[in-house]
A protein has these predicted regions:
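Bacterial N-terminal signal peptides
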Residues: 6-16
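Exposed aromatic-hydrophobic patches
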Residues: 65-66, 109-116
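Sec/Tat signal peptide C-region and signal peptidase I cleavage site
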Residues: 16-22
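Edge beta-strands of jelly-roll/beta-sandwich modules across compartments, strongly enriched
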Residues: 130-143
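Extended extracellular/luminal ectodomain segments enriched in beta-structured repeat modules
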Residues: 68-76
Length: 143
């Protein structure tokens, strides 16, 4: 019993220090809109990957998300923002070179699709084209 007491106290202290940030209403709305866009690709056999990335997109800044992709798969990256603005989604390889993608842009919603020739880490960029910025959400689909 004496051995478990320090372990329990350590867990208690560590969990007390963990700060969990609750999602804002804007992030929830952006995720809903991003899932709506991704749902259109599921009609073509794409599976929506579990998880999502939310954050803030600001003028003249890129919101980057690192993803590991596999050669031979097809991917669609869908993003949305709750605030009235125009966004774009771009994909870059591990050297920072932009890859050629199919694009969908509709104001607050955007998507980029491609099939990587090589497996590895890629960067997905959500860019603010017009507007003052705000919360965004990114989800991706594969097949």
């Amino acid at each position: 019993m004496k051995r478990w007491l320090p372990i329990f106290l350590l867990i208690l202290v560590l969990t007390d220090r963990v700060v969990v940030r609750a999602q804002t209403d804007a992030e929830v709305q952006a995720r809903k809109d991003a899932l709506d866009v991704a749902g259109a690709f599921s009609n073509d056999g794409f599976k929506i990957r579990d998880g999502h990335s939310c954050g803030l997109v600001k003028p003249h800044e890129h919101a980057l998300v690192a993803v590991n992709l596999y050669a031979g798969n097809q991917y669609w990256f869908s993003a949305a923002t709750a605030e009235p603005s125009k966004i774009a989604v771009s994909v870059y390889d591990e050297t920072g070179k932009q890859v050629t993608t199919e694009s969908y842009n509709n104001g607050e919603k955007a998507a980029a699709g491609f099939s990587p020739a090589n497996s590895g880490q890629y960067l997905v960029s959500v860019d603010l084209v017009e507007g003052n910025g705000g919360s965004f959400c990114l989800v991706y689909s594969y097949k």
